[in-house]
């Protein structure tokens, strides 16, 4: 399908085993269900189930609309498929489609905080499918149909919309259409054209193509200026071969019979067909400043590079993330459902689709503020031929599109719960962002533009090998695997790992021509610290961390990752023998904790055991600096067991003094303390202290000691269901990251990407 970029170029280098491992590691699959109410006591159970549950049951029986108040229905979308048109794989059946549907469900959650469950219906009979889905209506606030073959998808969607009172949306059709329409609006603006006069040719007559044509017609595009083509050529009035009612609805009077003839003098090409369908001669025959949307996946009808060789005046969009102007369904469906659910819409009508397309188009025209520029790797985009569609990780999407959809639903009378305070609604939407996922994606994209050489110090470990390969496969740079080649190759053969692929380089310390330089370098640092020359020789020849850190220190690598075989403090001691702190900075560890959509940075989780007041102030500055680099506006809480002097104690005084030091330094970020964790993180509790200088709940927590920082983050991870990244090492003069000994492959790849990112900033 031309929407969600499930098979883009950056992902084609993922190995089959990596994909299987990703889906099978830990709990198999990509979804789980977590309770939103406490289940700790007998009373909790009595409220959640019998006898307490009888009360909302009776309320819903008396007034069905209250189901939205007492159940999860109002934020629940079902992703439903029969697997008859899976990605580019075809009809592989309902069960085989489950990984795709789980993936779609997690995209709903990731991008718009919509809860979603996948349902695979094992039938190709349209009547059976419709009956199955229609009777599930009470369970959900909306239905997202996915990967259903044409023309069944048209029939199924239409019939379900007629019999259900909740939104039913076939994303393969309408998602692609909405994003393509948004891009078309902007491309026409840039080329001085409009919907009334532009001439468009669409190649492909499947679900997405038909939906694209229908939507732009609804937006005012002149039907007489649209020619639809399929594998048999132009769909013209009177044609009978290979026709159906959906194609016939868009047949036109024309004497043109082939795609090449149709494109002669055309302004716009919509491709929803196959690789190579658009030839160089066809591109040459198009009008001035042609608009080419080559949306076939995984390979477009023609690539931007191929177009550039033919002419330099074209605006090009594809379905791929490695080119500008990506037509990606994830720009649409999460936010469209978000807006529809929030007003309890009974359907998603044309007005709501058009509103989504226009909001997306307008977003690309707006000036990009500083906090949003980070989503574009610091390269602030400007409306133009290379930027007619925002990228999926633009944080403004969650605010702009649901708002437009909700307004359209209210204006057209399909909203059963109109929003009274739109300003407050906008703030609620912004609060649903998942910033750290966006941050990691921004880091990856930035590194792809400036690839780095990263040393994976424990190269003989299977996890390091797999992580190095993943780093190279994601086109982040060269992965330098440090270790004995014969040992690594023996392990790689046993584990089915290919070490000969591009982007992997094996470095054997004993055989390196740089051993002498590294030894001299390290000896110059350690000779007055009790080390003999032979001691340093031994470290360089036999100790992976010292060798790797020396590589980084002398510029033979941009960064390093280590930690699997030694505890954090030992690994850090190794590194610090070779690399100093940045001038004027303090080395600390910062962990990033994600829990229920909130992101909090916690420091110091790695270095300082019982920091002094001066050190606590330094830690606050370093952590706030990292928060800024990651795209956050820091609000720093200096934590203690007491809050603003009560109860008093010697250890709290140390934290209070740190706040005074920050006052004297006149730092440029919000901070306050000392305060307990509930005051820092709970807005209602914070309101009891109106003098608190934080403008909102804290997103940077400075702990009073290492033990409290380490214990709290590990408890969050193990008991609180949080995702914890780090500790990230901050303050060194060179880029080094140290993993925990229990780190997973994905953790190591993230740390390598962060090391590469820091090396370039």
Curated annotation (Swiss-Prot):
Its EC number is 1.1.1.40. The keyword NADP applies. It comes from the Bacteria. The keyword Metal-binding applies. InterPro entries: Aminoacid_DH-like_N_sf, Malate_Decarboxylase, Malic_enzyme_CS, Malic_N_dom, Malic_N_dom_sf, Malic_NAD-bd, Malic_NAD-bd_bact_type, ME_PTA. Divalent metal cations. Prefers magnesium or manganese. One of its GO terms (molecular function) is NAD binding. A divalent metal cation binds at residues 146-147, 172. It catalyses: (S)-malate + NADP(+) = pyruvate + CO2 + NADPH; oxaloacetate + H(+) = pyruvate + CO2. Its cofactor is Mg(2+); Mn(2+). Keywords: Metal-binding, Multifunctional enzyme, NADP, Oxidoreductase. In the N-terminal section; belongs to the malic enzymes family. In the C-terminal section; belongs to the phosphate acetyltransferase and butyryltransferase family. This is NADP-dependent malic enzyme. It comes from Rhizobium meliloti (strain 1021) (Ensifer meliloti). The lineage of its organism: Bacteria, Pseudomonadati, Pseudomonadota, Alphaproteobacteria, Hyphomicrobiales.
């Amino acid at each position: 399908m031309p929407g969600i970029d499930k098979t883009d170029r950056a992902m084609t280098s993922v190995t089959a085993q990596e994909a299987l491992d990703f889906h099978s590691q830990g709990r198999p699959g990509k979804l789980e269900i977590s309770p939103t109410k406490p289940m700790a006591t007998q009373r909790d159970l009595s409220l959640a189930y019998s006898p307490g549950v009888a009360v909302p049951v009776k309320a819903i029986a008396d007034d069905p609309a209250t189901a939205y108040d007492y159940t999860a229905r109002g934020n629940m979308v079902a992703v439903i498929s029969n697997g008859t048109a899976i990605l580019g794989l075809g009809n592989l059946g309902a069960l085989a489609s489950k990984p795709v549907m789980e993936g779609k469900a997690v995209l709903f959650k990731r991008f718009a905080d919509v809860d979603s469950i996948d349902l695979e219906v094992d039938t190709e009979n349209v009547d059976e499918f419709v009956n199955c889905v229609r009777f599930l209506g009470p369970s959900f606030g909306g239905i997202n149909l996915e990967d259903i073959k044409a023309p069944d998808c048209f029939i199924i969607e239409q019939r379900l919309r007629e019999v259900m009172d909740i939104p039913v949306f076939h994303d393969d059709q309408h998602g692609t259409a909405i994003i393509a329409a948004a891009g078309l609006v902007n491309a026409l603006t840039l080329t001085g054209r409009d919907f009334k006069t532009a001439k468009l040719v669409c190649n492909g007559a499947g679900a997405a193509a038909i939906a694209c044509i229908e939507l732009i017609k609804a937006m005012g595009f002149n039907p007489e200026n649209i020619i639809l083509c399929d594998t048999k050529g132009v769909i013209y009035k009177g044609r009978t071969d290979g026709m159906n009612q959906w194609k016939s609805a868009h047949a036109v009077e024309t004497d043109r019979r082939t795609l090449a003839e149709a494109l002669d003098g055309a302004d716009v090409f919509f491709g929803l067909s196959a690789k190579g369908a658009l030839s160089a001669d066809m591109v040459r025959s198009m009008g001035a400043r042609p608009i080419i949307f080559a949306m076939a996946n995984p390979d477009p009808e023609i690539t931007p590079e191929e177009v550039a060789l033919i002419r330099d005046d074209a605006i090009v969009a594809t379905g791929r993330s490695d080119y500008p102007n990506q037509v990606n369904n994830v720009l649409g469906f999460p936010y469209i459902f978000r807006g529809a659910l929030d007003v309890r819409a009974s359907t998603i009508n044309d007005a709501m689709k058009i509103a989504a397309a226009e909001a997306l188009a307008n977003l690309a025209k707006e000036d990009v503020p500083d906090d949003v520029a980070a989503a574009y790797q610091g390269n602030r985009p400007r409306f133009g031929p290379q930027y007619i569609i925002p990228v999926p990780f633009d944080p403004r999407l969650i605010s702009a599109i649901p708002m437009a959809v909700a307004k359209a639903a209210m204006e057209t009378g399909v909203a059963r719960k109109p929003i009274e305070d739109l300003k407050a609604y906008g703030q609620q939407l912004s609060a649903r962002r998942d910033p750290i996922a966006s941050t990691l994606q921004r880091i990856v994209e930035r590194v792809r533009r400036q690839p780095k050489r990263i040393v994976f110090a424990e190269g003989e470990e299977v996890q390091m090998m797999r992580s190095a390969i993943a780093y190279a496969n994601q086109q982040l740079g060269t992965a330098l695997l440090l270790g004995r080649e014969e040992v690594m190759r023996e392990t790689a053969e046993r584990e089915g790992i290919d070490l000969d692929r591009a982007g992997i380089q094996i470095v054997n310390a004993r055989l390196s021509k740089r051993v002498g330089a590294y030894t001299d370098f390290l000896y110059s640092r350690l000779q007055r610290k009790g080390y003999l020359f032979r001691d340093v020789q031994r470290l360089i020849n036999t100790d992976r961390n010292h060798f790797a850190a020396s590589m980084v220190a002398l510029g033979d690598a941009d960064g390093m990752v280590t930690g699997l075989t030694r505890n954090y403090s030992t690994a850090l001691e190794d590194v610090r023998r070779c690399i100093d702190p940045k001038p004027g900075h303090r080395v600390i560890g910062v962990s990033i904790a994600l829990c229920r959509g909130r992101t909090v940075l916690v420091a110091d989780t790695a270095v300082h055991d019982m920091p002094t007041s001066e050190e606590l102030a330094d830690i606050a500055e370093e952590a706030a600096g990292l928060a800024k680099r990651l795209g956050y506006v820091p609000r720093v809480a200096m934590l203690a067991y007491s809050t603003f002097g009560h109860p008093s104690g010697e250890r709290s005084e140390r934290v209070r003094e740190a706040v005074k030091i920050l006052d004297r330094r006149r730092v440029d970020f919000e901070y306050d303390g000392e305060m307990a964790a509930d005051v820092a993180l709970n807005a209602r509790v914070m309101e009891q202290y109106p003098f608190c200088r934080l403008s909102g709940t804290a997103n940077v927590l400075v702990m009073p000691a290492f033990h409290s920082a380490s214990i709290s983050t590990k408890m969050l991870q193990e008991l609180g269901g949080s995702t914890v990244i780090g500790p990230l090492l901050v303050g060194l003069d060179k880029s080094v990251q140290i993993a925990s000994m229990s780190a997973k492959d994905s953790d190591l790849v993230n740390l390598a990407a962060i090391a590469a990112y820091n090396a370039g900033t």
